[in-house]
Amino acid sequence: AALRIKDWVYKEIVKEPTVSIPNALEVLQTRKGDCNEHTVLFNALARAAGIPAKTVVGVVYLRGAFYYHAWSEVWLGDWVALDSVLNQFPADVTHIKFLEGEIDRQIDILQLIGNLKIEVL
């Protein structure tokens, strides 16, 4: 079920930069958003289907650089990361988790972004 929900969110939500702390109902209505919107909607749908889900926040390595990113983890006997923006299940090793919790915790990471020094070996 988690894979089908991830696939649906990936296909149905237009990838568009958004500055907000979204809720799932708004995302369902607008059908657009960035990683925050995708994650909030995926988590709500997964939980409605009886699958424990949580938000994780960190960075992802894309096109030669690290960028702020949010994605989901679902409980499938262990916590498994998945990314409904990048269509990954499980999410690959380019995802570096800094914290978990709901989207409103992302403020805790903002002071790190821009000050991080990450070396890819």
Question: How should these model regions be labeled?
Answer:
Residues K6-A70, V74, P90-A91:
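Active-site neighborhood of thiol-dependent amide/isopeptide-bond enzymes
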